[in-house]
Amino acid sequence: MQEHYQPAAIEPAAQKKWDDARIFNVSEDASKPKYYCLSMFPYPSGKLHMGHVRNYTIGDVLSRFKLLNGFNVMQPMGWDAFGMPAENAAMKNNVAPAAWTYDNIEYMKTQLKSLGFAIDWARETATCKPEYYRWEQWLFTKLFEKGIVYRKNGTVNWDPVDQTVLANEQVIDGRGWRSGALIEKREIPMYYFKITDYAEELLNDLDKLEHWPEQVKTMQRNWIGKSRGMTVRFAVSDDSKQGLEGDYAKLLQVYTTRPDTLMGATYVAVAAEHPLAAAAAADKPELQAFIAECKAGSVAEADMATMEKKGVPTGRYVVNPLNGDKLEVWIANYVLWGYGDGAVMAVPAHDERDFEFAAKYNLPKKQVIAVGDNAFDANRWQEWYADKENGVLVNSGDLDGLDFQTAFDAVAAKLQSQGAGEPKTQYRLRDWGISRQRYWGCPIPIVHCEQCGDVPVPADQLPVVLPENVVPDGMGSPLAKMPEFYETACPCCGGAAKRETDTMDTFMESSWYFFRYMSPKFSDGMVDPAAAKYWGAVDQYIGGIEHAILHLLYARFFTKLMRDEGLVNVDEPFERLLTQGMVVCETYYRENDKGGKDWINPADVELTFDDKGRPISAVLKADGLPVVISGTEKMSKSKNNGVDPQELINAYGADTARLFMMFAAPPEQSLEWSDSGVEGAHRFLRRLWRTVYEYLKQGEAVKAFAGSQDGLSKELKDLRHKLHATTAKVSDDYGRRQQFNTAIAAVMELLNQYDKTDTGGEQGRAVAQEVLETAVRLLWPIVPHICETLWSELNGAKLWEAGWPTVDEAALVKSEIEVMVQVNGKLRGKITVAADASKADLEAAALATEGAVKFMEGKPAKKIIVVPGRLVNIVV
């Protein structure tokens, strides 16, 4: 065995051994319990970042732990390869997105392999490959035929200069990120998935997810947003019907969760796209201008919540069905046409948003809820104004004095009797628009025919292949400029037709990839039925909490769609979810001449610390001049505080990177980058290596201790007790608790005790062998390369075949224990007694200790408190 730890030599050798034995390549095996462990697959951006390393190391630890415990472990990997960054990089570098993507995949795959992850690379999948998205297109056509996918107009951000649709994040202060042009809202035909048909099941099935973080489930419940309320129909005033047709000339319909406050409504607000707004604006330029302004604004609901609320009166009125009051209709920028009825009733006295709007435009506020003796002040919002739990109605005629639920029922009865409303359950969740006016995505498999309408592409003509030799110029959709792509024959009538040139939202690919991994080369369907039956749901899913809503919700939705198509036999995709924290690092900057900040990489900064090790000043190494310490933030390119994993691997080895990531913080918490922490991790691995080296230097490896320990010294018995207590703790930390930092700490403590124990002689050497073999197996999930090598030196066999160490219950039983002795609650000594010593024996032994005699000062004991197995407290 070589004397010094050399990761650059041992890590490739260990990886070759695993690859040659194909131990991570799995198939369905009914003789073993299955364990499907999956970390969210990466976008092939070019290089791994530390967040990737943490994410995939967590998954690898769990996978290797289960492998040693006899499970048939599948840990696949692939690439979420479609998306906007590839198009942006293509335009910047004048290269096709496909070429850029495939180059990145190759480099990142090399990086992942260098970290030694137990990945079944035979299952590798890239979502931009036709053999993958073919089945996505196939499912789309099936759902289109069933009506679960449908087409309707949707609102998008339109850049009039680049002639293209922009995502919300590409709109900066109302302008296009590339052209700088003022963005317009446009209505264009788009395809939608009826996720709302599954809203109730998506909500209810959250209760089945016992091993998901409660925070994630709460976020999904809020996103689905089930509410019980009422549809209320306000009659359009006779003097306000001009320009309106059909039902819109008769009624304005709104949904409210607070029908009890209907008597407090003082105006109604509608979206800019509402027919009533259009009718009112027909001869009013000021209304037309405001509507145009609204349409130029953001289409993101999140922006609606934070932007300044604006509105204009239409001069049109509707009638409150409860009291006959005429309420003016306002056009407001905070009302979304695509949500509900595109109209809301406003009760300024009891809704904070309406209160602010009414204050801005001097609209009346009518109190109809009272809470105790609290005084209503129309000039100042107070939280109790919206209290429906403790409030009762006032100023509401015969409804006065009613609580929320009673008033709800009474208003419902009145409105229903008039045909002016009815109770309704509504969801905040809206149908999922999947059309994207971009190139680098999965083509939508629809043909538009003037004779036959929208025709799904038949299964035998799939996939509709995306041309890969295209370099986008940012001016509209490239596919819409390629007759060779869009010109086709109608599958129904054979006449000239045009392919859909929109592509699918990239969330589509990530909504089912975990099923494709089960049979990635299966050519007769989305997933092989036998594989789907065996692997079932993902047992452990790992990823950032930023994916708590959209990705995880869409993945749950797709699972139910695929179940209903008979493709899988599970209701939920992920049994257990772990949301790892971010990797954060210090940030530093200097202010530049333009008033901005130039961010400086931590590697280029030299720090000065106070006597407690806290940084108090920083200078740039290059010039010795000060830089500002800006605090810790998530590693990012924008703050220039990232650390390249490849540099870390090159300097210290993959095991050091893995160990630091698992030891620095519990997995669900943020991990703060620390150079000293990395060095500490490397020191521990050198120490582990040295410990085994010194043991083998004294003689050849022996058979690990097993059997009765009656003949062992107390010191060796104590070491075996520590060993098996550590094994039990680490097993629980990996399996139930998923707290890897405490598992590592436990093994460190074990090695500390090993170093202090005399392991000479035949029995001592057998116990030493047992300790070292066990420590190596306990650490293999986290630092597999060094452990694989040390196991080979200690045992000569294959570690992955050795199995997880078992706990010797006999070793956990101590014949003697150490008990603290206190006098008046203060520690005055310790005694070693038989583990089964009686209360009287403990009292007698404690009273006889030197410390007790000294501090009792000859006084008699008033009381002796015995805590079995822990302490004796003598009270004098």
Curated annotation (Swiss-Prot):
In chain numbering, where does the motif 'HIGH' region fall?
Answer: 42-52
Gene3D superfamilies, A to Z: 2.20.28.290, 3.10.20.590, HUPs, Isoleucyl-tRNA Synthetase, Domain 1, Valyl/Leucyl/Isoleucyl-tRNA synthetase, editing domain
Q: Where is this motif: 'KMSKS' region?
A: 634-638
Taxonomically, the superkingdom here is Bacteria
- What does the record give as the reaction this protein catalyses? tRNA(Leu) + L-leucine + ATP = L-leucyl-tRNA(Leu) + AMP + diphosphate
Q: Tell whether Signal is among the UniProt keywords.
A: no
Keywords, comma-separated and alphabetical: Aminoacyl-tRNA synthetase, ATP-binding, Cytoplasm, Ligase, Nucleotide-binding, Protein biosynthesis
- InterPro entries in UniProt: aa-tRNA-synth_I_CS, aa-tRNA-synth_Ia, Leu-tRNA-ligase, Leu_tRNA-synth_edit, M/V/L/I-tRNA-synth_anticd-bd, Methionyl/Leucyl_tRNA_Synth, Rossmann-like_a/b/a_fold, tRNAsynth_Ia_anticodon-bd
UniProt-listed GO biological process terms:
leucyl-tRNA aminoacylation
Any one Gene Ontology MF annotation carried by this entry is: aminoacyl-tRNA deacylase activity
Cellular localisation: Cytoplasm
Q: Which Pfam families match?
A: Anticodon_1 (PF08264), tRNA-synt_1 (PF00133), tRNA-synt_1_2 (PF13603), tRNA-synt_1g (PF09334)
Q: GO cellular component terms?
A: cytosol
Q: Which positions in this protein are listed as binding ATP?
A: K637
Name the EC number(s): 6.1.1.4
Please give the PANTHER family that the UniProt record associates with this protein.
LEUCINE--TRNA LIGASE, MITOCHONDRIAL, LEUCYL-TRNA SYNTHETASE
Annotated family: Belongs to the class-I aminoacyl-tRNA synthetase family.
> What name does the UniProt record give this protein?
Leucine--tRNA ligase
Species of origin: Neisseria meningitidis serogroup C / serotype 2a (strain ATCC 700532 / DSM 15464 / FAM18)
